[in-house]
Amino acid sequence: EPFRGRFADPYDGEVAASDAAVGGFLAALKKKGLYEKSLVVFLSDHGEGLGDHGEDEHGVFLYREAIQVPLLVKLPSARAGEKPPLAGSSVATPVQIVDVLATVADAVALPGVTPPEGTLSLVRLAAGEKAPPRRLLAETFYPRIRFGWSELRSLVDGSWQYIDAPNPELYDLATDPGEKKNVVADKAGPIRAMKAEVEKRKSGFVAPEAVDEE
């Protein structure tokens, strides 16, 4: 409450509660005279299935509804009364949550901070800097830890999205943004290259294990 009773769908109530919490936070910054000088980053760590691809939660699959999340940045204003730099700008280049550190370090000139190799600053992208080509990796271990199924990994390369699974999937996001038509049988070349990239990335990570509930 007060949102639970106002919405038939509990998820809608959660969205409204989150919206109110963010609004209250921004209002408090303004009331204290801190909003203009503040760097504000709003993001989510995951999306939600809501019935898409048969999933009514999150964590099981790696389709766009789960891995494409909001990421908004408000930069500090140079002087009181001025609009924040790059206000209203958007970035068409696909980015990752790991790009937040590079963005924050760039926005407020954090001393002694070296962002991880391969990450990008959204500040520079919004200002017009071109991003180098990147393959974006996502992964979920929830199916293995929770159900004993296979873990999944997804690699986005341009318009292609490859899902590394016991039955691999490949989607052309340019023509099929809803990921309805698996074209893995028709695209052996992209599959080989993306599968090799996933295997290379896997070798550099340690997989998490389930936490004992006790």
Where are these regions (language model features)?
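Catalytic domains that recognize anionic headgroups
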Residues: 1-214
